[in-house]
Amino acid sequence: MPGRRRRVFPVVAAAFAIPVVLVVTGVGDGRVASANSSGQTQIAAAPITMRILLPGVGLERGLQVKTILAERAISARFPEITEIGGVRPDGMKWHPEGLAIDVVIPDYSTPAGKELGDRVMAFAFQNADRFGLVNVIWQQTYHPIGGKAHRMADLGSDDANHYTHVHIATNGGGYPNGTETYAD
């Protein structure tokens, strides 16, 4: 699976950059109105706090925006993940069209590896709307949004059966144009 291994420098840089908080002053639901001593109404925007998500451990080239968001959020949430595959040739549309990532699970065959994969899958479902989640495949089981999970046919290897990685497919949201901000 193509992906990028986590390097020491980006991890150290991220340790300083990820905690940075962007404060956005909005005009929507965050507005607060109050009357001053002269009876005039003053409107102040309440700050909305978002954490900017830096590029994660996966290669983003060719991924669509919601898939990038999922990749970055998973990279930020799970520092033990060191490889995420993205665009690659495949007979189905998901990877070639930038609609899916493969989150490689270290020591996938151990209880700790299974537990990590389960947490990654749960995180994807907790953020289903945000990520435009379509389905997750983990440990030979297909989990569609709004449908019943079912066991897949044996495809012959741990990799093909999705034991080595959690496959996360999104509806994409279109290709990035360079003006996107990815945030929690």
Can you name each region flagged by the protein language model?
Residues 108-184:
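Catalytic cores and adjacent binding grooves of peptidoglycan-active enzymes
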